Amino acid sequence: MDLEAKVKKMGLGHEQGFGAPCLKCKEKCEGFELHFWRKICRNCKCGQEEHDVLLSNEEDRKVGKLFEDTKYTTLIAKLKSDGIPMYKRNVMILTNPVAAKKNVSINTVTYEWAPPVQNQALARQYMQMLPKEKQPVAGSEGAQYRKKQLAKQLPAHDQDPSKCHELSPKEVKEMEQFVKKYKSEALGVGDVKLPRDMNTQGPNRMYIPGGDRSTTTAVGAMEDKSAEHKRTQYSCYCCKLSMKEGDPAIYAERAGYDKLWHPACFVCSACHELLVDMIYFWKNGKLYCGRHYCDSEKPRCAGCDELIFSNEYTQAENQNWHLKHFCCFDCDNILAGEIYVMVNDKPVCKPCYVKNHAVVCQGCHNAIDPEVQRVSYNNFSWHASTECFLCSCCSRCLIGQKFMPVEGMVFCSVECKKMMS
């Protein structure tokens, strides 16, 4: 795909989810409207994952593209219409008879994702070992959690140049090489197994999720398996607690066949969130989600949230920025050489700070300039001047003096306080 086509495709992405309500801001947000280059809503400044955007097909395309040209192609299918790879996520539907007084009804539970194993009982056990609020039951808090983690852990702009803002041809090429490298060296998908089954696993046997699930024994493993199992004690690589014989465990091929995790312990070592759909990246003995693996390899722009492939970028406030994206969070004016104030880890220009964020002086009731000295006590502030920081009774200047605060007032003495009470 040429660069012009990629830019056109990027523009179409701004139409997705338009007008969707914000789950965090509720009625305060007029509806989702994607900022031109930030990955946030222009109206409320929350991310797309905080909005009720229906993106199941888009997410399946994103994960499908991630698995393209990897050993995990068994987990994708290509659409006949345009050849786009789609993620074949495993959906599990459980039916439980519910006895009533006169008849028996059927209670159906649908999991929007489940481990791709043939043994449904094993998949069900896996789900039960996850925190209830993280079980991806359709229409539940857990399904919303999975949706949010798909967006957070596997950003489309970490693998697809067409989802990025104005990359140069050189940057596009570097990004494509970077993606190819992490697909071949770090990307993996966990597999759910019983610890006793790990005795058939070894360096000469490889498992591909969604592929052949035969129980072929590893080369050289000819001794009695029951005797071998009695000698083997498995513990979780994360929490170090022992594995129970009948409980499912997660195996990550890139980590080695000797390492297992409890389902609830298969988390990113940086954000400590469950690895969504058991998709992991392995580096230096640690599990990472896609986002934090990429962060360990490349600087990420704090403005657009994209990885930086340019040799020239700026660093400020312990964060990295594309030169063109070091801008005011409120008005988008470039801040190079300008005075700015950090508000919730976001840079804001001086005019926007005074207009939208500055504290108000209790004395003169005007906004306090960020470069001006002030006196603060609890949630109240004053200009540190002889005109503003005064006794609320006798107007004596209190700079450098002891004072008695009472809500938004200050007094120089008990007598003045009594006179105002």
From Swiss-Prot:
Keyword Ribosomal protein in annotation: no
PET domain: residues covered: 92-199
InterPro entries: LIM1_Testin (IPR034958), LIM2_Testin (IPR034959), LIM3_Testin (IPR034960), PET_domain (IPR010442), PET_testin (IPR033724), Pk/Esn/Tes (IPR047120), Znf_LIM (IPR001781)
Species this chain originates from: Muntiacus reevesi
Keyword line: Cell junction, Cytoplasm, LIM domain, Metal-binding, Repeat, Zinc
Stretches assigned to the LIM zinc-binding domain: 234-297, 299-359, 362-421
Protein name: Testin
Family annotation (SMART domains): LIM (SM00132)
A Pfam entry, by short name: PET
Transmembrane intervals: none
Stretches with biased composition (Basic and acidic residues): 155-164
GO biological process, one term: negative regulation of cell population proliferation
PROSITE patterns: LIM_DOMAIN_1, LIM_DOMAIN_2, PET
Family: Belongs to the prickle / espinas / testin family.
Gene3D superfamilies documented for this protein: Cysteine Rich Protein
Function as written in the Swiss-Prot or TrEMBL entry: Scaffold protein that may play a role in cell adhesion, cell spreading and in the reorganization of the actin cytoskeleton. Plays a role in the regulation of cell proliferation. May act as a tumor suppressor.
Record region (Disordered): 133-164, 193-213
Compartments (UniProt record): Cytoplasm; Cell junction, Focal adhesion
Domain characteristics, as noted in the entry: The N-terminal and the C-terminal halves of the protein can associate with each other, thereby hindering interactions with ZYX.
Complex and partners: Interacts via LIM domain 1 with ZYX. Interacts (via LIM domain 3) with ENAH and VASP. Interacts with ALKBH4, talin, actin, alpha-actinin, GRIP1 and PXN. Interacts (via LIM domain 2) with ACTL7A (via N-terminus). Heterodimer with ACTL7A; the heterodimer interacts with ENAH to form a heterotrimer.
SUPFAM superfamilies: Glucocorticoid receptor-like (DNA-binding domain)
Recorded GO CC terms: cytoplasm; focal adhesion
